[in-house]
Swiss-Prot record:
One of its GO terms (biological process) is mRNA splicing, via spliceosome. Plays a role in pre-mRNA splicing as a core component of the spliceosomal U1, U2, U4 and U5 small nuclear ribonucleoproteins (snRNPs), the building blocks of the spliceosome. It comes from Dictyostelium discoideum. Belongs to the snRNP SmB/SmN family. Residues 265-274 have a biased composition (Gly residues). This is Small nuclear ribonucleoprotein-associated protein B.
Amino acid sequence: MSGMPKSSKMLQYINYRMRVTIQDGRVIVGRFLAFDKHMNVVICDAEEFRRIRQKGKEDREEKRTLGMILIRGETVVSMSVEAPPPEEAKLAATSKMPPQIPGGPGIGRAVGRGMPMGGMGMGGSGPMSGLTGPVRGVGGPAPHSMMPGGGVPPPMGRGGFPPQGFPPGGPSPQGAFNNNPNNNNGGPPQGFPPGGPIGRGGFPPQGFPPGGPMGGPNLNNGNMPPQGFPPGGPMGRGGFPPQGFPPGGPNFNNMPPQGFPPGGPMGRGGFQRK
């Protein structure tokens, strides 16, 4: 409708059902949508009616559905009103706002990822609205992964931190004795020194030599004596003799000890002194 004055009489027939007759005798009936100064016409829901003449018979009319078509103004012979516009077309023409579609159960909201209108210089107790992260369930990880404490803590004694209320270091070494039924972490009960009972592989309390008390079992395979004893252990067990004693322990190979002539005492089967 470009170039047409607003006071044109053709404007009042918009959305009417019109009958357009063209030069070849066909009649187009449809809803009148638009026109221009050249009288080019746009028709929707168009139906074509053609009259066919037969010799010796009456003329018959043939109908064909076309849909939306554009009719050139140079072929238009006449136009007439066929029917008034439908009810929905009247409501759309009279109302200023288009008919609104009723909303569903959900509510669409914009995801806040931009900076707030007040800028970064605005003071406030909480974080700015543009820096709060994505809305839960939209553009981010799953909600359960954002909750604190979601991971499984590492087991005690393997490099992880102990739970709250437990001493650091995890359970005591293997072999420590636990006679406290309420103590389930393998450590010594309250009131006992660390390392478990004496002589079971733990560290001795302060003031005692390592390896257990005197007379207790030596757990180092007899190689090193406890603190305060000469090296070598008891004589005759394969260790080094104390200072002032010959090495080797008792003589079992018919050799006299150091400082005695070879052969041993006379009269016992040894070698006699020359």
